[in-house]
């Protein structure tokens, strides 16, 4: 028996440096984000939006584009000025070790490409990141939607996002009072609600800017090309709660998706009138004491909406954090095996992102493009998906 134990200990000791070495190699490996599944090429631009009330947002816009020559380089995942700040924020060597070298991530977006002329105008989707994330951290979802004929707009708000780097070189990090990890209980929930309300107002401001861009874009790119009568909103985590809040607040929203976000505030009692979908991770992997209240709030919203305008989907084995590009970048089978052993995930990260992109684009196709509702109930090829109601 002692001999067996010694052998197991020796194998463990030998496995550690191998695991560390493979993880370090994975950090530097070039990673191409999942290829968009739609027929359009994808373009990307940024806008610095301001108004007299001192609201300022750094917006990223992905859109259906005219295809360019295959040899043309795609946009950086993050511009160099952003990358240096994000790398600095990561801080410790361990954090660098466990995360991706962003300079090695390849997108499918062409910088400043001409918007596609296949349609006279395109519906608009506003995308809101989670609490600590940058909107570019959801590039896989944005590119896929753009490839299906949507103009996708995401923004990073100064003081309420981990960091914003403006074109003039200003770097604005999140204000200490917006760090929810430093709070707990009722104080944390109240501050989260305040952030949701502020972000909802930001979405309204972003749509105001898009209306101006549609009427008088100096570059001519988006002039008359934005169909602002067909606006959808989705977000992840606290951004998902924001998507529902904005649809509650503003009739310009025609459909919303909450991706694994806990609803907050008055929408729990009042719900929303627009079609909505909850796209959820596998909460069976979490304690019922934590998920019970969230499920009750989702049920409250769900029960107040007609049956043909609501949907709740769970991706079995999905992890909360892998709806972002964190899932899309996780290609190492070894690291996935470790996450499964730790109980942090049961399905491949890229698989989770693929399922999410399918259901997000299909939902908006149904409610913004009048695709058949039966498309949302087509489970072919997605055995991990469970329709809750």
Q: Positions of the model-derived regions?
A:
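N-terminal Sec-pathway targeting helices
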Residues: 1-16
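Alpha/beta-hydrolase-fold serine-hydrolase catalytic core, especially in secreted/extracellular enzymes
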Residues: 2, 6, 27-36, 50-52, ...
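Domain-level recognition of soluble alpha/beta enzyme cores
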Residues: 22-125, 345-349
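Active-site machinery of serine-nucleophile hydrolases
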Residues: 65-66, 76-97, 136-183, 312, ...
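Short substrate-entry loop that stabilizes the transition state in hydrolases
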Residues: 104-165, 285-288
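The feature captures the conserved acid-bearing segment of alpha/beta-hydrolase catalytic domains
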Residues: 117, 254-320
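Alpha/beta-hydrolase active-site loop
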Residues: 165-225
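Primarily recognizes the serine-hydrolase "nucleophile elbow" in alpha/beta-hydrolase
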Residues: 206-271
């Amino acid at each position: 028996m002692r001999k067996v134990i010694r052998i197991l200990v020796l194998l463990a000791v030998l496995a550690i440096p191998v695991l560390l070495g493979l993880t370090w190699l994975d950090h530097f490996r070039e990673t191409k984000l999942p290829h968009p599944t739609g027929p359009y090429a994808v373009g990307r631009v940024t806008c610095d939006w301001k108004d007299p009330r001192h609201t300022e947002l750094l917006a990223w816009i992905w859109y259906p584009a005219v295809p360019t020559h295959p040899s043309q380089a795609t946009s950086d995942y993050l511009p160099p000025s952003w990358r240096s700040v994000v790398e600095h924020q990561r801080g410790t060597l361990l954090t660098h070790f466990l995360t991706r070298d962003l300079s090695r991530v390849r997108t499918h977006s062409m910088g400043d490409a001409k918007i596609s002329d296949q349609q006279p105008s395109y519906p608009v989707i506003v995308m809101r990141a989670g609490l600590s994330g940058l909107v570019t951290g959801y590039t896989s979802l944005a590119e896929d939607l753009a490839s299906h004929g949507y103009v996708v707009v995401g923004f990073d708000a100064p003081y309420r996002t981990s960091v914003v780097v403006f074109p003039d070189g200003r770097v604005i990090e999140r204000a200490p009072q917006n760090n929810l990890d430093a709070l707990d209980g009722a104080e944390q929930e109240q501050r989260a609600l305040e952030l949701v309300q502020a972000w909802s107002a930001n979405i309204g401001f972003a749509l105001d800017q898009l209306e101006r861009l549609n009427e008088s874009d100096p570059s001519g790119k988006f002039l008359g090309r934005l169909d602002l009568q067909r606006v959808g909103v989705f977000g992840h985590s606290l951004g998902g709660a924001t998507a529902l809040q904005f649809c509650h607040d503003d009739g310009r929203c025609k459909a919303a998706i909450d991706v694994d976000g806990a609803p907050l505030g008055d929408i729990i009692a009042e719900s929303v009138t627009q079609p909505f979908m909850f796209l959820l991770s596998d909460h069976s992997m979490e304690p019922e004491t934590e998920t019970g209240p969230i499920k009750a709030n989702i049920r409250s919203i769900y029960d107040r909406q007609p049956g043909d305008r609501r949907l709740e989907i769970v991706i079995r084995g999905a992890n909360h954090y892998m709806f972002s590009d964190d899932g899309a970048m996780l290609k190492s089978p070894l690291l996935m095996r470790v996450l499964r052993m730790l109980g942090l995930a049961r399905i491949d990260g890229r698989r989770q992102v693929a399922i999410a992109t399918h259901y997000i684009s299909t939902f908006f196709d149904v409610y913004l493009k009048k695709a058949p509702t039966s498309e949302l109930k087509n489970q072919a090829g997605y055995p991990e998906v469970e329709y809750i109601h």
